[in-house]
Curated annotation (Swiss-Prot):
Family, per entry: In the N-terminal section; belongs to the complex I 30 kDa subunit family. In the C-terminal section; belongs to the complex I 49 kDa subunit family.
Matches recorded under Pfam families: Complex1_30kDa, Complex1_49kDa
Source organism of this protein record: Rhodopseudomonas palustris (strain BisB5)
InterPro entries per UniProt: NADH_DH_suCD, NADH_Q_OxRdtase_suD, NADH_quin_OxRdtase_su_C/D-like, NADH_UbQ_OxRdtase_30kDa_su, NADH_UbQ_OxRdtase_49kDa_CS, NDH1_su_D/H, NiFe-Hase_large
Signal sequence annotation: none
Keywords: Cell inner membrane, Cell membrane, Membrane, Multifunctional enzyme, NAD, Quinone, Translocase, Transport, Ubiquinone
Catalyzed chemical reaction(s): a quinone + NADH + 5 H(+)(in) = a quinol + NAD(+) + 4 H(+)(out)
Underlying gene: nuoC
UniProt name for this protein: NADH-quinone oxidoreductase subunit C/D
Length: 581
């Protein structure tokens, strides 16, 4: 069934509750529906339609009050967009509902997609949208005492535009009280079978939480009865920053959304921007992008591997693996000039070509790693203590993973072979020979095994890049990306006219909506951009895998011991900047 057929089926089923399809350049349909039909339409798409849309990929809000180019769309002050995915169809659909700008309110869909709860809380936090029947209609990324909703167009984007902040003693006490682990506020039980439960703050300053993040636990002895993650301590307003940067100057920020993913964070953003501009990236630039992305995948997974072993009691592996990561960093630094945040990609290509001797450095690393991985298998994966601490711990099946929006190794560990690089190839991944590692039981052990095997597959991809690196340009010949060649500039001034605006204001993208999706180290990362025909983004929505994965803790943790929670958190492999943005 095509996207057009699906829209027709929705119209036949729900009548005038379906307002129509928005014309976009996306590969999936965007359908406007009435707010009162939202839950029913989402339920139909998840449970009743053929080859259903079982995953809510993302849900976000858009402040439409300052937007100039909305041709063909119904009037809306605040728009709620939800992005659904059908893995069986390998297809997506985006639903939109129009709300009033002054008092935006609609019904929650958390009863249909449980992972909608955090996304709806974020829409309330950032835009002030109230969701009826939402059990926790409270802030999620900002502190409880925050005034206003910062993603509204009436809110300033710079700290210098806000009143001077002064932390008085009274304000400090109020904020400290607001962050107390109140069971009622977090929806935690206080008793079980007549026994009073202990409420424990797990984090935010704990090595086991892998970042500034806490979980409020209700414990019966060492057993976890209920768990409520509390996030936002690392929030930096990445989506708001995008609205005051040009399309070019926002690129360095994408590296820092997942600060361990390196250049991989640039890929979905560039994918969307290049789609908007109609830019064809040269083959050499695409292959360099793939090679560097896979090197960063290896570096991330080595960090995961070592810290996962450390979390379960093995101290030595992490030190060996940091030696390997340092070798990889030398390769990255030699090619890009930086280590963690290269900012190496550009709209239409790369910032510079590969240096002389790059292939020798990469081959040396490729020859080094396989025997090291064999050694680590004995140290970690065949270690009886590690197996006892991880087998059968934190297990969930594919249906549960899809319900909670789990992607990447966390989904593949359940036995579901879904990888964006294979299902929806980008950057030339269709030309590479590699396998998708999968698990069986979906537990901590399988999540570790999947990532270890992904290291081997990434080595295989990188070797193909080295062996088959094409010659040619590293940037597209396009006025939004590259100045004309000097010989043409000196010939006549006309060659500079198209480049003038892009160089002075920043590139101007055609008005419209554009989406980029890639398989980053943690799973599906999606950038949904709105251009209003200006040098800056009107709305940049960043869907990160870690945000979805942490929400699942409340569903998986009950019944575990506290020590098992440490292993489970390590196996998720989240990064708090990826969660909080």
């Amino acid at each position: 069934m095509s996207g057009t057929d699906l829209v027709s089926e929705l119209s036949a089923r729900f009548g005038d509750a379906v307002l129509g399809e928005q014309i976009t350049r996306e590969r999936f349909p965007t359908v406007w529906i009435r707010p009162e039909a939202s839950a029913a339409v989402h339920r139909f798409l998840k449970h009743e339609v053929d080859r259903p849309f079982r995953m809510l990929v993302d849900l976000w809000a858009i402040d439409e009050t300052a937007r100039k180019h909305r041709e063909g769309q119904p009037p809306s002050g605040i728009t709620i967009a939800s992005h659904l995915m059908s893995h069986e169809r390998n297809a997506d659909i985006r639903l939109k509902i129009a709300l009033d700008a002054e008092y935006p309110s609609t019904k929650s869909i958390a009863g249909v997609f449980p992972n909608a709860a955090w996304y709806e809380r974020e829409a309330y936090d950032m835009f002030g949208v109230e969701f009826e029947l939402q059990p926790h209609s409270q802030r999620i990324l900002l502190p409880p005492g925050w005034e206003g909703h910062p993603m509204r167009k009436t809110q300033p984007g710079r700290a210098t535009e806000r009143p001077l902040f002064n932390m008085t003693a009274a304000l400090f006490d109020a904020k400290e009280h607001a962050l107390a682990a109140d069971p009622e506020k977090f929806g935690l039980p206080t008793h079980r079978d007549g026994v009073e439960l202990m409420i424990l703050n797990y984090g935010p300053h704990s090595m086991a939480t892998h970042g500034v993040f806490r979980i409020v636990l209700a414990l019966d002895g060492e057993e976890i009865v209920a768990a409520r993650p509390d996030i936002g301590f690392h929030h930096r307003g990445a989506e708001k920053m995008a609205e005051r940067q040009t399309w070019h100057s926002f690129l360095p920020y994408t590296d820092r959304v997942d600060y361990l993913g390196g250049v991989m964070g640039e890929m979905p953003y560039l994918q969307a921007v290049e789609k908007a501009c109609g830019i064809t990236v040269p083959d050499r630039a695409l292959m360099v992008r793939v090679m560097l992305s896979e090197i960063f995948r290896i570096m991330n997974h080595l960090l995961f591997y070592g810290t996962m072993a450390q979390d379960t009691g093995a101290m030595s592996p992490v030190f060996y693996m940091f030696v390997d990561r340092e070798r990889a960093y030398r390769v990255i630094e030699s090619i890009t000039g930086a280590r963690m945040h290269p900012g190496f990609f550009r709209i239409g290509g790369l910032s510079m070509d590969l240096p002389q001797g790059w292939d020798g450095l990469v081959r040396e690393f490729l020859d080094w790693m396989p025997s090291r991985l064999d050694d680590y298998e004995g140290m970690v994966l065949r270690n009886e203590i590690f197996r006892a601490r991880t087998k059968g711990v934190g297990a969930y099946d594919t249906a549960m993973a899809l319900d909670w929006g789990v992607t990447g190794p966390g989904l593949r560990a359940t036995g579901y072979a879904w990888d964006v690089r294979k299902a929806r190839p980008y950057a030339g991944f269709e030309n590479f020979d590699f396998e998708i590692p999968v698990g069986v039981n979906g537990d901590c052990f399988d999540r570790t095994v999947v990532r270890v095997e992904e290291i081997r597959q990434s080595l295989k991809i990188i070797r193909q890049c080295v062996d088959n690196m094409p010659s040619g340009p590293i940037k597209a010949d396009h006025p939004l990306t590259t100045p004309p060649p000097r010989e043409r500039m000196l010939h006549d001034i006309e060659t500079m006219i198209h480049h003038f605006v892009g160089a002075s204001w920043g590139p101007v993208l055609p008005a419209g909506e554009y989406t980029g999706q890639v398989e980053t180290v943690r799973g599906l990362t999606q950038f949904a951009l709105i251009s209003d025909g200006e040098p800056s983004s009107y709305r940049t929505r960043i869907r990160t895998p870690s945000f979805a994965h942490l929400q699942m803790i409340s569903a998986v943790a009950p019944g575990m011991m506290v020590a098992d929670l440490v292993a489970f958190l390590g196996s998720i492999d989240y990064v708090m900047s990826d969660v909080d943005r």
